[in-house]
């Protein structure tokens, strides 16, 4: 009886990896061994950066709010403290958009906090 070498599964596995590395540069897209290593590293970066993206956006929103507050003479920390005391429930993303797109509404919120 002939030995079954499982050829179709072997080819399918390699094909699946090489399909995922289609846009990679050099031998990383065509050499299975390098493609497999690069794909694993890419997946690690993707997993890490899904977490980092959240941090980066929060930092961006805070810096935008701080920049908008520099005209009003209120610091960011006092502003957030005032939001909590005034029981205004607006998150940093919305505040950042207000500071950029609707300056008058943002200034009204700052005036409300100063009371």
From Swiss-Prot:
- Which superkingdom does the taxonomy of this entry point to? Bacteria
Keyword field contains RNA-binding: yes
Q: Which UniProt keywords apply?
A: Ribonucleoprotein, Ribosomal protein, RNA-binding, rRNA-binding
Entry GO terms, CC? ribonucleoprotein complex; ribosome
Q: Which Pfam families match?
A: Ribosomal_L20
Picking any one GO biological process from the record gives: ribosomal large subunit assembly
Question: Could you tell me what this protein does?
Answer: Binds directly to 23S ribosomal RNA and is necessary for the in vitro assembly process of the 50S ribosomal subunit. It is not involved in the protein synthesizing functions of that subunit.
Q: Which PANTHER family match?
A: 39S RIBOSOMAL PROTEIN L20
Q: What NCBIfam families does the annotation carry? A: rplT_bact
Q: What is this protein called?
A: Large ribosomal subunit protein bL20
Lineage of the species this protein comes from? Bacteria, Pseudomonadati, Spirochaetota, Spirochaetia, Spirochaetales
């Amino acid at each position: 009886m002939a030995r079954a070498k499982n050829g179709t599964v072997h080819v399918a596995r390699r094909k699946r990896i090489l399909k995922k590395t289609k846009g990679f540069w050099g031998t990383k897209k065509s050499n299975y061994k390098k493609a497999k290593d690069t794909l694993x590293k890419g997946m690690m970066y993707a997993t890490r950066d899904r977490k980092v993206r959240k941090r980066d956006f929060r930092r961006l929103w805070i810096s935008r709010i701080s920049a908008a507050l520099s005209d009003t003479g209120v610091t960011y920390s006092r502003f957030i403290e005032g939001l909590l005391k005034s029981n205004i429930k607006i998150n940093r993303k919305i505040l950042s958009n207000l500071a950029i797109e609707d300056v008058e509404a943002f200034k009204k919120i700052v005036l409300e906090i100063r009371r």
